[in-house]
């Protein structure tokens, strides 16, 4: 390090006569030096005089830096015994240092002063430009950047010789060297906003940028309070000087200790001064300054309030973070009533403290932060470069390539650039031959790669016989070297190995002159999807931007049209069906399965491309898109075109729909046949009965359809239980169509009693029902002989219709026309008994059947009377009475009618199931309703019913002895109910359980026995004695 840093001293430095007249040869001592050395000999004994402003000054302080460096080299060549005196004299001469701390006698050493004169003459003669200029206004401070507007624009240090460059670019903490103060007053009196400092022939406008330039390179780690302007500097003895380095060392503490604080403060305060606002207490001028000399170091260019969207508290946070200090808000006081309080908040910003009042704590915090920002002595952070608002006019920084990538991704197209091989630069550009790039500086031969054009930073200025860089620091500074320096290779590979020269004239290089090479334009090909664009530019990047701009013009129109089409499609979708729905509908009409399948996915993860296949029967189409839904839609659109080529549909394809519609007329036909069967019997009420059946059948059919009472699966299971065989087994045979098909077909097979039937349907449930219906019809056709017209009509009817037809069947059974099925209990007809849930319908059926079958029931009642008469003659002592016999006749008639009614209505399912609890529950309500019907249809009084009740119980006991089964009555107390309950159990096969209800236990037993007799008559056991 060969820098010679000297600090400014608060003493006048007047060189007006010397620099303007240049007539100092007649003086023994240099006039400029006499003004300095005279007071310097007396400065150690007396305090310095107050600073005075000279009338005018030349601009000698801002000399060329190259000559100053030459002067320093001459000073280093002096002998060691003269080093101390020369250093002190040089310091006094160059910096106005009254306080030179030299231990030697300066006035007696004429040789040293002669050398100083020679150096000064050399400086004056070499700076002839300065002597001819008229005196300008008094300079404020030396500004090494004033004559270098380029460096000011880039906020960099002035250029130095090459061997000094590393020292200046390394650290920001140390102040820049060679800051020469040309006046006695310190830098804190300067105001850069006044345009009063003309710097060595430079424009005044450049001086305004000096604070920014130095501000970027000089940082203060802590707050500096400037001491008073005039201070008494005590001499410090200088240690022995042994080498030349001790004299010229810029950081030597032994020679500048007494003046070091002022040096640091002047150099650090100089860039931090700003133009204060015009107020009474903040105004600072040359003659008015506070006692401590402290000034706010806020820079107007970095004002914290420049950001519109940042609150004062946010700016304080940035200020504290920038200066590496802590800040804290404290609520120090609350005063005033509860509804209108005033809060005092104190902000501790490092060592500073600010307080503010507000009606809200947050408001007081912001006020304290605003006060701190305005009055703080800490350095403000540099303003951040704010990006333009979204959608603003400054959104031009987006390059065409970036915009093209976004648009192509939106359209689902891939982009890639294809470079011509002749445009590719050489790969081995790290170390050119002989470190000079000889093959790049000479013109390449035919077929060789052409050198790319230079970047913006590679422009150079022509000066003398060599090339010198422009003042701005280049991106790759190691590429630039002076005429006398040897070039060295770069440490890291860069984009351009060596910038090619510009211009058509011959250039001078380190290996001799070489002609300029014309640079051909770069050419690149851009592919966007299946489209091709060619871009041309001076550089490869410009060619890419040109190609991207051409592609954008085409793709933007495509994107607009695509968005319009999508909008129209979305509007039309509300009116018509999508292509996918249309394909499914056509598949259902033509009985063809429709299936969509994603075949493959292509492209990167952020821009997938899907290929989906649409399969309808044997026709396959493919669709492509950036989403599965889009590709599926496009495949469906292609499929619609293919399906339109098929021949038109034939009407035979809709037969399954016709078969479904045929079911309803079948029920009405069965009802019609039922009406003909019922009306076939003669009776007085034949004329009115068909009209009543027509009136009651339609609502009954609707109820059955709603409640699904005629489920063939249930009917088949009940039939198997009645026949004491295994339940039917259902099995799915085939399934036509996949999960995505709108209409599928299932084939179900059911097997029971060695018979098998199949059914088809669009669902498994429907196929199962169809199969059960087919098997049920098959099993009933096997049981019943085809000669029985009544039974054949019953097979085609529903359960409700069948229950209405069973009364004639029982009559035929009484006459012996229906073959009996052999059971352990006795013969029983082969009919299926189903449970009826519609009680009102039962009542109507019972009434109709009773009126139409009066004669047949009377014949059956006579047979029952004979059985009852035999029982009464054997067991009753009072059976001879005519009244008893008449009552027995009436009761027997009632019992016969009840048995016929029960046979017709099918009031109990106990003959099918052995579950006693279900039987009790089912027979409870039915028997209660039937008991009312019996009362209505009978002409006997209640007393006759009660007296005949004994006969009902005894008749059941007598019948049990004849058929060899046991009867067990179980009585339950009244409890909370109004009636008594009796349960009768019959040990028949299967066992039967019935219950009865009455106001007394006797009545309940008779009711239970009556219900048991009804069940036995229903099973045909009452005919066993014949």
From Swiss-Prot:
UniProt-annotated binding residues for RNA: 606, 608, 628-629, 632
Composition bias, Low complexity: 70-111, 192-210, 234-256, 864-890, 902-920, 934-947
Main location: cytoplasm
Assembly with partners or alone: Component of neuronal ribonucleoprotein complexes (RNPs) that contains at least various translational repressor and mRNA turnover proteins such as me31B, tral, Upf1, AGO2 and sometimes Fmr1.
Compositional bias of kind Polar residues: 112-126, 285-303, 678-688, 891-901
Organism this protein belongs to: Drosophila melanogaster (Fruit fly)
Domain named DRBM: residues: 311-378, 490-557, 578-645, 711-781, 951-1018
Modified residues (Phosphoserine): 563, 570, 676
Name the UniProt record assigns to this protein: Maternal effect protein staufen
Known tissue expression: Polar granules at the posterior pole of the oocyte, and by the time the egg is laid, at the anterior pole.
């Amino acid at each position: 390090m060969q820098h010679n840093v000297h600090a400014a001293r608060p003493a006048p430095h007047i060189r007006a006569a010397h620099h303007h007249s240049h007539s100092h040869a007649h003086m023994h001592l240099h006039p400029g030096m006499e003004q300095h050395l005279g007071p310097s000999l007396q400065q150690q004994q007396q305090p310095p005089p107050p600073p005075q402003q000279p009338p005018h000054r030349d601009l000698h302080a801002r000399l060329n830096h190259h000559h100053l460096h030459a002067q320093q080299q001459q000073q280093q060549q002096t002998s060691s015994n003269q080093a101390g005196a020369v250093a002190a004299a040089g310091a006094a001469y160059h910096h106005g240092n009254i306080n030179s701390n030299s231990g030697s006698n300066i006035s007696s050493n004429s040789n040293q002063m002669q050398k100083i004169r020679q150096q000064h003459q050399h400086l004056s003669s070499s700076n002839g430009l300065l002597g001819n200029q008229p005196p300008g206004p008094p300079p404020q401070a030396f500004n090494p950047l004033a004559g270098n507007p380029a460096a000011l624009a880039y906020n960099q240090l002035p250029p130095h010789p090459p061997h000094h460059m590393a020292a200046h670019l390394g650290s920001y903490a140390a102040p820049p060297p060679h800051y020469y103060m040309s006046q006695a007053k310190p830098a804190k009196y300067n105001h850069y906003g006044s345009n009063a400092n003309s710097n060595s022939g430079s424009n005044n406008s450049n001086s305004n940028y000096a604070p920014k330039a130095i501000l970027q390179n000089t940082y203060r780690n802590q707050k500096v309070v400037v001491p008073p302007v005039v201070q008494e500097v005590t001499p410090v003895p200088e240690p022995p000087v042994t080498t030349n380095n001790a004299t010229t060392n810029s950081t030597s503490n032994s020679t500048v200790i007494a003046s070091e604080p002022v040096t640091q403060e002047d150099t650090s305060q100089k860039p931090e001064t700003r133009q204060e606002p015009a107020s009474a207490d903040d105004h600072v001028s040359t003659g008015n300054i506070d006692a401590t000399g402290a000034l706010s170091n806020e820079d107007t260019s970095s004002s914290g309030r420049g950001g519109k969207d940042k609150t004062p508290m946010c700016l304080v946070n940035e200020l504290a973070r920038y200066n590496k200090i802590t800040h804290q808000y404290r609520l120090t006081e609350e005063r005033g009533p509860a509804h209108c309080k005033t809060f005092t908040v104190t902000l501790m910003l490092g060592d500073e403290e600010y307080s503010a009042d507000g009606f809200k704590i947050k408001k007081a915090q912001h006020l304290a932060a605003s006060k701190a920002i305005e009055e703080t002595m800490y350095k403000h952070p540099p303003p951040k470069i704010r990006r333009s608002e979204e959608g603003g006019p400054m959104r031009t920084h987006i390059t065409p390539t970036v915009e093209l990538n976004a648009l192509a991704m939106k359209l689902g197209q891939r982009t890639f650039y294809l470079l011509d091989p002749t445009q590719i630069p050489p790969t081995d550009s790290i170390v050119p031959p002989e470190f000079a790039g000889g093959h790049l500086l000479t013109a390449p031969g035919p077929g060789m790669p052409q050198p790319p054009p230079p970047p913006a930073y590679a422009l150079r200025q022509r000066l003398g016989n060599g090339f010198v860089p422009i003042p701005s620091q280049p991106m790759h500074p190691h590429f630039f070297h002076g005429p006398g320096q040897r070039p060295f290779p770069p440490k890291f590979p860069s984009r351009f190995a060596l910038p090619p020269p510009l211009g058509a004239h011959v250039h001078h290089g380190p290996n001799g002159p070489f002609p300029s090479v014309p640079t051909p334009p770069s050419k690149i090909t851009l592919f966007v999807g299946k489209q091709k664009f060619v871009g041309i530019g001076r550089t490869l990047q410009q060619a890419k931007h040109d190609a991207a701009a051409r592609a954008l013009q085409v793709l933007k129109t495509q994107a607009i049209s695509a968005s319009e089409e999508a909008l129209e499609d979305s509007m039309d979708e509300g009116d018509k069906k999508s292509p996918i729905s249309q394909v499914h509908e056509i598949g259902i009409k033509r009985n063809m399965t429709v299936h969509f399948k994603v075949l493959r996915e292509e492209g990167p993860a952020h821009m997938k491309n899907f290929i989906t296949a649409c399969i309808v029967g044997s026709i396959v189409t493919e669709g492509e898109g950036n989403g599965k839904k889009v590709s599926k839609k496009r495949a469906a659109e292609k499929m619609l075109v293919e399906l339109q080529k098929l021949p038109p549909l034939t009407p035979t394809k809709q037969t399954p729909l016709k078969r479904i519609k045929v079911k309803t007329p079948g029920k009405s036909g069965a009802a019609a046949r039922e009406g003909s069967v019922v009306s076939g019997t003669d009776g007085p009420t034949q004329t009115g009965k068909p009209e009543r059946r027509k009136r009651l059948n339609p609502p009954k059919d609707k109820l059955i359809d709603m409640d699904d009472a005629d489920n063939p699966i249930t009917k088949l299971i009940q039939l198997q239980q009645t026949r004491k065989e295994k339940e039917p087994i259902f099995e799915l045979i085939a399934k036509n169509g996949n999960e995505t098909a709108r209409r599928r077909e299932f084939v179900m097979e059911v097997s029971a009693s060695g018979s098998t039937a199949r059914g088809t349907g669009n669902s498994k449930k429907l196929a199962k029902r169809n199969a059960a219906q087919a098997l049920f019809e098959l099993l009933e056709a096997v049981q019943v002989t085809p000669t029985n017209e009544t039974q054949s009509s019953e097979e085609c009817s529903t359960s409700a219709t069948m229950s209405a037809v069973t009364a004639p069947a029982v009559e035929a059974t009484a006459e012996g026309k229906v073959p009996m099925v052999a059971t352990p209990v006795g013969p029983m007809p082969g009919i299926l008994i189903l449970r009826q849930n519609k009680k009102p319908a039962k009542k109507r059926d019972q009434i109709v059947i009773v009126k139409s079958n009066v004669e047949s029931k009377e014949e059956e009642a006579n047979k029952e009377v004979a059985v009852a008469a035999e029982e009464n003659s054997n067991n009753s002592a009072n059976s001879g009475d005519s009244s008893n016999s008449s009552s027995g006749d009436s009761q027997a008639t009632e019992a016969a009618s009840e048995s016929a009614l029960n046979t017709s209505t099918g009031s109990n399912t106990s003959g099918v199931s052995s579950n006693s609890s279900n039987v009790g529950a089912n027979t409870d309500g039915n028997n209660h309703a039937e008991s009312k019907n019996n009362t209505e249809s009978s002409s006997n009084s209640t007393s006759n019913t009660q007296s005949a009740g004994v006969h009902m119980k005894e008749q059941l006991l007598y019948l049990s002895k004849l058929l060899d089964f046991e009867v067990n009555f179980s009585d339950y107390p009244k409890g909370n109910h109004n009636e008594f309950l009796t349960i009768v159990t019959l040990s028949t096969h299967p066992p039967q359980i019935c219950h009865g209800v009455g106001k007394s236990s006797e009545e309940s037993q008779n009711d239970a026995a009556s219900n048991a007799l009804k069940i036995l008559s229903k099973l045909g056991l009452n005919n066993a004695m014949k």
